[in-house]
């Protein structure tokens, strides 16, 4: 599937973020996340869907924002530095039959484990206790 040829044929739907109230709704309906440095990727990782990180300003960004030393290698998806690279990678991901998602499975799991307490099975009761303390 070639993105440039199919946008006009509506084979690819690009949703306007202003039409949805909650970004979590958008994540459910999205097949892929094109992201930058946003923590949205952490939440999107739970969906097990592919992610691409578009970082055209990376050199400038790291000059004023401190990132983990191994930031790029720990992302749950590939990163690109130009729009052309983005289009090429997006075309490849859309045609690969899930291989891209399988390739980044371990990074995605590590990402989720780093930012979520996935082993906590008492979240509901803790939330209930919290609500009771403020009522």
Task: Give residue spans per PLM region.
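Donor nucleotide-activated moiety binding/catalytic core segment of transferases
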Residues: 1-42
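Catalytic binding pocket for nucleotide-activated donors in carbohydrate/polymer assembly enzymes
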Residues: 3-10, 39-115
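Short, contiguous acidic/charged loop-to-helix segments that flank catalytic cores in large enzymes
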Residues: 15-22, 74-77, 115-118
